């Protein structure tokens, strides 16, 4: 009946499922059965029969192929206790262990291992049968070869070729058993501390948090391989090897030669200041290596594509020994630190000052603000600004650097050349808060640049809600908001390259283990900040700063150069602490490199002296420009001797006092530009 037909149909359906399943199993067994069988069998083997084959982490090089970080092959010394403990009957049929003493002696002699530890492993209840005891890690290839040469010295020689003593030695060394070597890799940094902030370092296990090592860690890492054994149907051990896949290599935009130029300039600054302060001139190394300021930072950038050519700060640590605090603290200070304090001290050293620290830029911000005013058509070349030495804003006096003198009537070019705060405040009033903030955003302030390095800070800028007349006034000359060095360098580059804002970056290409390029980091044009016409104008204005204005000490004879000085009081105002800076470009007609230097709290009596930063930039350009195949042209008519005043006002004949700098104000609350103490502390922590 109908029920019988349903049962038959159900039965046939079930049978079809089983037939299909059987066919599938047969197919899998025929095509992949051996692979799966090996994997299952391998799970039952001891670690001696199944081990990880480590990958080789990719290298980091500079743009010319100089190795900055690489992984060298090293070896772990493994002892097969079971084999070394093999029992052999002597002539009297007694059990002996002839392999133990020769093996232990050789391990102690060639690897400096502890004899007691080895013997404890050979006799311990949980280890004496072990076939995998790691005795030493990361021994060199030379050490491995020396051990193997000792073991094999007589192995291929016949006894008749040896005298009696040599025959005995051959028999003795033949009893060295159970020692084998497991390949591993050790990360090494051939240039030690050079570019340490940029490169970063790895922890154990090829993990990293800092620098290029951290940002590109997943690219640099490869995939571990595996060697595993299994017993076949004849109970014979067979080995299968899945080779490790090496990591990719990162070719950076950095040029080691430029990095060395930067380092030398910072060292020369350190030595110069220490000797001026009475240090022993003969103690050259200490004078050069000990920073003569709270912080010093330098960025060298190609303004035409965003490539970072060099970047350095003054906390130099050895990438091969990054936890060594002795260059920075006394042993007593180190011993007194708890774990948290030690980690805080290390983190402060490891961070990249040029991207992680935000600060008030001071007058190096003025060129961007003048360019913004031109873009808004609120000023032109004929607009005049009358500097009376101060401006009264919202009932408060805010001084210019010329106070109690004046700069008089000035054009926009004069305002920049003289670094006149009064003129800048008048420009800010013409712009208005909303447009001023819009152009801060266009130039990238308050936003991440997106540089391919970890730990970049945002900086802190005002909003329309927090920017009143006073905040606008102080912001025009670079106080009351914060930036990072890389933000400032990228914004300034766009100002002088035709108005093109390129994303700063440190990776040029990524290559595989054969050297083939698998990824190229093409210049990323993010936006247009100003027109090409305004960019041309700003280059001309900034050239005037170097030839006739506050930046004369940065001038290199025979070259056309432009730039801007900065002297910013640190909070709280009036404490005598300053951050001085200079940002420059050369040559003016076709800029090849932007160089930006900061000296934070220099170790001098009068910190308000931008010449300290100008001298660093001048020294860098003196070496950098010929290296970039830019050669002197003496037709510019400038000697390059520079200004001796050390101020940002060429009309001031002597070094300014603490309250007479370009960014001084009468009221510290006004100087703060509306930022609270807590906000400024937060910025400094970033």
Where do the protein language model's features map onto the residues?
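Periplasmic/cell-envelope proteins involved in peptidoglycan metabolism and beta-lactam response
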Residues: 1-331, 434-441, 555, 573, ...
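Beta-lactam-recognizing serine transpeptidase/beta-lactamase-like catalytic domain environment
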Residues: 69, 75, 231-241, 296-599, ...
């Amino acid at each position: 009946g109908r029920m019988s037909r349903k049962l038959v149909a159900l039965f046939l359906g079930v049978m079809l499922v089983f037939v299909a399943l059987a066919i599938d199993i047969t197919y899998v067994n025929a095509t992949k059965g051996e692979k799966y069988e090996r994997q299952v069998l391998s799970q039952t083997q001891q670690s001696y029969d199944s081990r990880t084959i480590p990958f080789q982490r990719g290298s980091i090089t500079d743009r010319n192929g100089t190795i900055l970080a690489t992984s060298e092959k090293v070896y772990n010394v493994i002892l097969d206790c079971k084999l070394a403990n093999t029992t052999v009957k002597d002539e009297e049929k007694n059990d002996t262990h002839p392999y133990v003493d020769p093996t232990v002696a050789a391990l102690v002699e060639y690897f400096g291992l502890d004899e007691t530890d080895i013997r404890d492993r050979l006799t311990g209840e949980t280890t004496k049968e072990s076939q995998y005891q790691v005795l030493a890690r990361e021994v060199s290839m030379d050490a491995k070869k020396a051990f193997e040469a000792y073991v094999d010295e007589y192995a291929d020689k016949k006894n008749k070729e040896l005298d009696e003593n040599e025959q005995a030695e051959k028999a003795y060394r033949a009893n060295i058993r159970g020692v084998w070597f497991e390949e591993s890799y050790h990360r090494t940094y051939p240039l030690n501390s050079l570019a340490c902030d940029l490169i970063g370092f790895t922890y154990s296990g090829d993990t990293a948090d800092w620098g290029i090592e951290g940002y590109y860690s997943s690219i640099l890492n490869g995939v571990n391989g595996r060697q595993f054994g299994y017993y076949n149907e004849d109970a014979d051990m067979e080995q299968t090897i899945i080779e490790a896949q090496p990591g990719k290599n990162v070719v950076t935009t950095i040029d080691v030669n430029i990095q060395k130029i930067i380092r030398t300039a910072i060292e020369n600054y350190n030595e110069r200041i220490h000797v001026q302060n009475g240090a022993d001139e003969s103690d050259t190394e200490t004078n050069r290596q000990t920073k003569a300021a709270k912080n010093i930072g330098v960025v060298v950038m190609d303004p035409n594509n965003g490539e970072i050519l060099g970047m350095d700060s003054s906390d130099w640590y050895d990438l091969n020994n990054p936890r060594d605090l002795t260059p920075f603290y006394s042993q007593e200070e180190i011993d007194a630190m708890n774990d948290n304090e030690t980690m805080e001290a290390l983190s402060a050293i490891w961070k990249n000052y040029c991207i992680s620290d935000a600060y008030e830029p001071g007058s190096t911000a003025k060129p961007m603000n003048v360019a913004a005013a031109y873009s808004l058509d609120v000023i032109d070349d004929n607009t005049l600004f009358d500097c009376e030495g101060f401006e009264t804003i919202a009932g408060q006096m805010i001084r210019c650097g010329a106070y109690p003198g004046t700069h008089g009537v000035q054009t926009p070019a004069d305002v920049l050349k003289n670094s006149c705060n009064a003129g800048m405040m008048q420009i800010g009033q013409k712009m208005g808060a909303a447009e001023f903030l819009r152009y801060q955003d266009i130039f990238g302030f308050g936003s991440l640049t997106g540089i391919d390095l970890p730990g970049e800070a945002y900086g802190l800028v005002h909003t329309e809600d927090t920017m009143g007349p006073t905040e606008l006034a102080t912001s025009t000359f670079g106080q009351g908001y914060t930036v990072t060095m890389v933000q400032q360098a990228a914004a300034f580059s766009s100002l002088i390259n035709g108005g093109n804002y390129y994303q700063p970056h440190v990776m040029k290409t990524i290559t595989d283990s054969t050297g083939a390029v698998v990824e190229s980091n093409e210049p990323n044009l993010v936006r247009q900040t100003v027109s090409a016409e305004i960019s041309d104008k700003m280059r001309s204005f900034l050239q005037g700063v170097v030839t006739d204005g506050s930046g004369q000490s940065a001038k290199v004879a025979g070259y056309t150069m432009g730039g801007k000085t900065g002297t910013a009081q640190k909070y709280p105002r009036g404490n005598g602490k300053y951050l001085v800076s200079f940002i420059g470009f050369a040559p003016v007609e076709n800029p090849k490199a932007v160089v930006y230097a900061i000296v934070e709290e220099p170790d001098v009596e009068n910190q308000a002296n931008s010449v300290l930063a100008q001298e660093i930039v001048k020294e860098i350009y003196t070496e950098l420009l010929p290296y970039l195949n830019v050669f002197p042209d003496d037709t510019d008519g400038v000697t390059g001797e520079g200004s001796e005043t050390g101020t940002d006002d060429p009309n001031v004949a002597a070094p300014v006092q603490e309250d007479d700098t370009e960014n001084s104000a009468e009221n510290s609350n006004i100087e703060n530009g509306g930022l609270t103490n807590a906000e400024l502390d937060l910025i400094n922590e970033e």
